[in-house]
């Protein structure tokens, strides 16, 4: 399962933040997806394939161990691993609005180091979805 929460993203856009019960977490210095993460992503892929007007952003994060540069690289690789897996599950490349790593720039002090080795996914209404809603479709 997953929790969804309406949020403002880093660009102050309305988004739905998707948090999976199992988390999309990674081992130290790794961008390899766990079986739990793959199962969660397969469920997300089904939703994204049903509504191809939904765009997503994938943001990779790290703990604070190691250099800034190393953490930026690992966080990007984590985001790319999620993007590649979702594409392997049939999600259209056009749905990926943003795929990036932020290293430990957005480190969450309320989480443990292992919980900060994560990827966060945001879902957005596409331009077409917004136009359809405004037109009453």
Each predicted region: which residue ranges?
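N-terminal targeting leaders that direct proteins to extracytoplasmic destinations
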Residues: 1-15
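Periplasmic peptidoglycan-binding/anchoring modules of Gram-negative envelope and division proteins
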Residues: 3-4, 25-60, 87, 121, ...
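Short acidic/polar alpha-helix capping motifs at helix-coil junctions
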Residues: 7-9, 48, 71-73
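Envelope-exposed proteins and targeting segments
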Residues: 12-16, 20-22, 29, 52-54, ...
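Residue-level preference for alpha-helix termini and adjacent loops
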Residues: 23-25, 32, 73, 106
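Periplasmic OmpA-like peptidoglycan-binding domain that tethers envelope proteins to the cell wall
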Residues: 61-137
